[in-house]
């Protein structure tokens, strides 16, 4: 029971900080004068998350194996304390641009949804039409609602990402993990993803994006979504090829390093899609709803993880657990290739949806620009 309580605290803490920290970081830049820097910020923001994953994914297991369980958690606690001290010190030095508290925008949005269903109209909730909400807030809410289909496009790709700890891990168990005389833990391959994210982020920010901007070829938001989703499909294709190679050879003979391309492809896709989704939630949402949009973006990622778990469970007849004591027998009836085919198809459907949504995105973007240029001050949420 104590463990469940602690997991609940992690959930509350992560949910509270994740939806706000990226918004606060982006608010340190001027929306017009630093427009290009906002894209750079979200690229490096996502890279910094993965830098933490690298440190945690490598140092923590070593401390756990070489010292003890307590030391591994004390290390993480020390990192949290250091981050908190640095953050508070920055506030003490007046280094932050801080938006004024405006009440619970989440509660207000929920009320708008309920009243809109009750009255079968969003417009009828305006005070000018005898509704309960200020006209400006309803206009902002409409812009926010139009963002939801765009943010939902992250679901197929995040379902692919979830397989790094399921199907990809099982695949690694069946491979030769000998690395210069050391039997590498299969789960350690997961660290290829954050390492690749950090490296590719720097390459994109320093080389590719500046070159594209100079030639006025910087891809739009949904084109980046499209590229990211295609890279997810490419990762699955790489995993499928590796799976067929494993099936064609005796177990434990194919090197685990053949998994690197699929992890690198996912890493590149994460930068194009996930970091861009953070950017969309911030730049396209009205001022008082940016944190709400960020939270909804994270909710869609959580939905993707839940759907991935459900699909994995539904496909369990194809995906038997790998048994090290009876490896050959556990492979009988295994069809991870079918599972990969399904996910590749899902990714391609998601990529096509990204392209089909481009006209809708242009209307949403135009509406967001109009709201931002109208000079309407943030509406206080009561």
Task: Please provide the spans of the model-predicted regions.
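Hydrophobic transmembrane alpha-helices of multi-pass solute transporters/permeases
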Residues: 1-382
